[in-house]
A protein has these predicted regions:
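C-terminal helical "lid" subdomain and adjoining coupling/linker elements of P-loop NTPases
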Residues: 72, 276-283, 296-373
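Short alpha-helical scaffolding segments that buttress acidic/His motifs in well-ordered protein cores
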Residues: 266, 290-294
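Conserved ASCE/P-loop NTPase catalytic core
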Residues: 2-260, 271-288, 301-305, 382-496
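Elongated, mostly alpha-helical coiled-coil "stalk/stator" tethers of large membrane protein machines
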Residues: 360-375, 379, 383-386, 399-402
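Amphipathic alpha-helical interaction surfaces
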Residues: 61-64, 87-91, 206, 296, ...
Length: 496
């Protein structure tokens, strides 16, 4: 019978006659995953960088009918993975109409469900629950109580129904029983107090729930997914050992392992409007630089590695990069523009809020650390485009940067305004002796726009390798010879 025909069924009797059979949620997930694997269908769409690591682990856990704990630093798509698991549920399932815990018509758990079927039999009304409504998420915080998750005796309900507190009908169910036949996610599990974690023991293993000494057998049909940050184990709490023992699969997530994957994630997640896309062109070089900032932050001695550096840093920084170029174009009355290396300094505010600094970083200050990370990103990416300047210090071979450096040593400087018109920007770069020749040497076939971006990049790259002096001013970036104004050099150049 097709799903369209099934949805027309409104009573238990009709459901029986249709030959419908229910199954528990873990079998649903398993069966639908098996079908997806056989057909080659992608299950976790948009989850990048996990195809050979995390996703196979999740698939194994689902096939094993396991509860899952996703362990990883912030910004590693743990919650997104959990939410996408609803795609493996059946599109619709039947529930007893009016049941607060989504009773299965063939195996009701609640007093309401059992009584309804006892009274109405095959005339029991059913309704169809869509898989999109079968996902429940709870953020673990220290103020969460057992009553919130499991339930409590409701004295008002007992009084209205004129029943004793020992009657099951006096119970007000908490979030977990109300999530029966659903995927239930508890985020940041270590933040849950130990005594609250203990309340989950029997639900996970035996299906019992206890409410203020009222013990009842209620084999809830749940797929639990927990998320946790390793930092939480020491800073805020821990997962108690018996609970950890009952979570059958613990899967460790990770950050993107290379720039290309990280870049794809950023392009997928960044919120850039159509107007911005039409106005601002962002060269691939700048996209690589944005991603490199996150990679530098994860290795930096100024950043707390235990806290992690979320993928949201790259996403926010990329959005700021586009907005910086867009703002310049709007101010100058330009209909379109190409993002520049200097626009990356507009990403500092995005970087500041995404990194946790250690003591040394706090001493330097968040802005200086952000500037330092940008400089390090430029330094790391520079050798992917041009020869390593360091090698010419050690070897007696012709230095391709020599004419550029000599031009600055001859008492020339270059002051690039952050809001420079394109023609003025190009004119200034063209004035640097040896710069055009260097670009033609390595990128002769590049477009005019690309060549000017590369020219600017060369100056930043040489500064990051201490071949030139770069001064970041309020409204411009000034390039001078290495030995001038050393005492006024900006923050990041002084960080080592």
């Amino acid at each position: 019978m097709s799903m369209k025909e099934l949805l027309k069924i409104k009573t238990l009797g009709d459901l029986k006659r249709a030959g419908y059979q229910t199954k528990n949620i873990k079998d649903e997930l398993r069966d639908n995953l098996i079908n997806s694997l056989k057909s080659g269908e992608e299950v976790f769409k948009g989850i990048l960088g996990y195809s050979t690591t995390v996703i196979p682990e999740i698939q194994r856990a689902i096939l094993s009918r396991h509860h899952i704990n996703l362990l990883g630093l912030r910004g590693q798509a743990k919650t997104r993975i959990a939410r996408q698991m609803t795609a493996l549920l059946d599109e619709y399932i039947p529930v007893i109409s009016g049941s607060e815990i989504h009773d299965d018509p063939f195996a009701p758990l609640s007093h309401y469900g059992r009584e309804t079927i006892a009274v109405k039999g095959d005339d029991t009304a059913i309704e169809w629950m869509h898989r999109g409504d079968r996902f429940v998420e709870k953020l673990a915080t220290p103020d969460v109580t057992v009553a919130d998750l499991i339930g409590d005796i409701d004295p008002i309900k007992a009084a209205n129904l004129k029943i004793s507190y020992s009657d099951e009908r006096a119970i007000h169910f908490g979030l977990i029983p109300r999530s029966n036949r659903c995927i239930f996610v508890i985020n940041e599990l270590p933040d849950l107090q130990a005594r609250i974690q203990v309340a989950l023991f029997n639900i996970l293993q035996e299906g019992d729930i206890q409410i203020r000494g009222f013990r009842m057998r209620m084999p809830l049909d749940l797929q639990f997914i927990f998320t946790a940050n390793p930092e939480d184990y020491t800073n805020r709490g821990s997962i108690v050992t018996p609970l950890k023992d009952r979570i059958q699969s613990q899967i460790v997530t990770h950050y993107p392992k290379d720039i290309e994957i990280s870049k794809t994630i950023t392009q997928q997640e960044a919120k850039i409007s159509k107007d911005q896309l039409a106005m601002v062109e962002v060269p691939d070089l700048l996209k690589n630089l944005i991603e490199q900032i996150s990679f530098e932050a994860r290795e930096s001695e100024y950043v707390d590695a235990k806290s992690g550096v979320s993928a949201r840093l790259s996403i926010s920084a990329y959005e700021n990069l586009v907005s910086t170029a867009e703002r310049r174009a709007l101010i100058l009355g330009e209909k379109s523009t190409v993002a520049r290396v200097s626009d990356i300094w507009g990403t500092i505010s995005a970087i500041n809020g995404k990194i946790e600094l250690v003591y040394e970083g706090e001493q330097e200050g968040p802005v200086n650390v952000a500037q330092f990370l940008i400089s390090q990103a430029i330094r790391s990416q520079f050798i992917n485009y041009f020869p390593d300047p360091e090698r010419f210090k050690r070897k007696k071979e012709e230095n391709p940067y020599q004419r550029i450096i000599q031009w600055f040593n001859a008492n020339h400087d270059l002051d690039i305004l952050l809001e420079e018109k394109q023609q003025d920007f190009e004119k200034k770069l063209a004035s640097v002796d040896g710069l055009s020749e260097l670009i033609d040497l390595y990128y002769k076939k590049s477009s005019v726009k690309e060549k000017f971006l590369l020219k600017e990049f060369v100056l930043y790259g040489l500064a990051s390798y201490s071949q030139l002096n770069r001064l970041s001013l309020d409204s411009s970036v000034l390039f001078k010879d290495l030995f001038s104004s050393v005492f006024t050099s900006d923050g990041p150049e002084n960080l080592n």
